[in-house]
């Protein structure tokens, strides 16, 4: 067992010795994205394991070690960690935990401390917790985001966004069930072999689009399209949203869910806006502007690759930002900030009027930028059909799915009325 080393504040560090022998567990948020991230870290000498466990036992473990008023994503991720450590599959003396930390004003920035508190409560204080962030928070001698590693991680996010975008547009129409998921597996292996090359991105993206366009499919013009927005973990995570995307597809829908690139551009953008409004943190302004510019460039590459095909690509960030200005200030940055409202407007402009706004119960930012904006959106866009769905330990899956089914019933009724009017 590696020697336990603590910093001056008493935080257990992840050391270079631990890097050689410890398994690092990370909770799953975006299935495609995190599979690619797992591959990258393993290629760079880490032993990373992506947790994909589900079930009520995860919630129960979370409730044992986290206050039930804490954010639902925190409860789930901590429950998933504790469940894995108790499973016997991992040596608790040779296991570390990793959590993505934004460093923003959302309570998600405190998840790291809640994880440590839970570990102490269940007698596993010897397990180090690593913060994965770009805000220079909690440095560890055994974990370094080197330029090469960071470049691969960033490019992998862009590849994963493209894979998710195409998969959502192909899977509901595929002739042979499972073809789309097999193609994702194929491209996961290919991208790993390419080391998630940035220089080959343009060429590779075009090939990915070509491969997805060749999946045998049957058009279904009457298929209902449903957009999914909300708090970042609940929106994407199958554990957090009770497999919402799969449920919608089982109900005969095509799901549209915005990619992670928009959120990363938004993170850079709000630092730029903050500096322009308050004239502070000029160094952060320069860095944020560079991050924003890079991801906007990558988004444009995806739009260009998808352009000639039958698929539709993401809306350019600046266009979405301009559309949301009459509704909410660009200075509204907590949680998903104005971006969540912009995503709903963007979907409606694309003709996707049916939207599920998924959020943890009691998530203050989402009550403002999600639920709080629905009335105004309905007034401006009467055709919009938006349903907010809360997720928490006491919410039953049946009630959530029944509310979504009611929204889908309204969507089918609107479709039939439109058909009748067009005849």
Question: Where are these predicted regions, by residue range?
Answer:
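An N-terminal assembly and electron-transfer interface module characteristic of large anaerobic redox
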Residues: 1-423
């Amino acid at each position: 067992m590696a020697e336990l080393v603590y910093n001056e504040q008493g935080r257990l560090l992840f050391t270079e010795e631990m890097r050689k022998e410890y398994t690092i567990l990370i909770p799953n948020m975006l299935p495609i994205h995190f599979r690619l991230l797992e591959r990258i870290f393993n290629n760079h000498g880490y032993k990373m394991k992506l947790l994909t466990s589900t079930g009520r036992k995860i919630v129960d473990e979370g409730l044992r070690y986290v206050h039930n008023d804490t954010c639902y994503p925190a409860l789930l991720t901590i429950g998933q960690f504790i469940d894995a450590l108790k499973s016997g599959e991992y040596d608790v003396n040779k296991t570390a935990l990793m959590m993505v930390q934004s460093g923003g004003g959302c309570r998600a920035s405190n998840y790291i401390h809640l994880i440590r508190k839970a570990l102490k409560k269940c007698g596993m204080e010897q397990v180090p917790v690593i913060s994965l962030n770009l805000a220079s928070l909690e440095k560890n001698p055994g974990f370094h985001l080197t330029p090469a590693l960071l470049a691969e991680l960033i490019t992998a996010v862009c590849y994963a966004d493209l894979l998710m975008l195409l998969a959502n547009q192909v899977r509901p129409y595929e002739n042979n069930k499972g073809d789309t998921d097999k193609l994702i597996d194929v491209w996961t292996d290919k991208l790993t072999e390419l080391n998630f090359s940035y220089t080959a991105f343009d060429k590779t993206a075009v090939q990915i689009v070509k491969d997805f366009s060749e999946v045998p499919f049957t058009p279904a013009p009457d298929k209902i399209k449903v957009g999914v927005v909300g708090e970042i973990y609940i929106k994407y995570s199958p554990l957090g949203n009770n497999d919402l995307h799969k449920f919608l597809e089982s109900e005969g829908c095509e799901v549209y869910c915005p990619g992670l690139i928009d959120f990363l551009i938004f993170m850079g953008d709000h630092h730029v806006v903050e500096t322009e409004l308050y004239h502070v943190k000029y160094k952060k302004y320069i860095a944020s502007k560079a991050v924003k510019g890079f991801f906007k460039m990558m988004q444009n590459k995806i739009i260009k690759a998808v352009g000639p095909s039958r698929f539709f690509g993401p809306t350019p960030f600046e266009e979405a930002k301009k559309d949301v200005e009459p509704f909410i200030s660009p200075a509204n940055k907590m949680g998903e900030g104005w971006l969540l409202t912009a995503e709903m407007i963007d979907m409606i402009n694309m003709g996707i009027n049916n939207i599920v706004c998924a959020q943890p119960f009691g998530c203050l930012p989402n009550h403002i930028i999600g639920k709080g904006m629905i009335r105004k959106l309905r007034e401006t866009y009467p055709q919009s059909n938006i349903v907010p769905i809360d997720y928490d330990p006491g919410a039953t899956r049946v009630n959530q799915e029944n509310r979504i089914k009611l929204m889908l019933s309204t969507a089918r009724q609107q479709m039939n009325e439109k058909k009748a009017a067009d005849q």
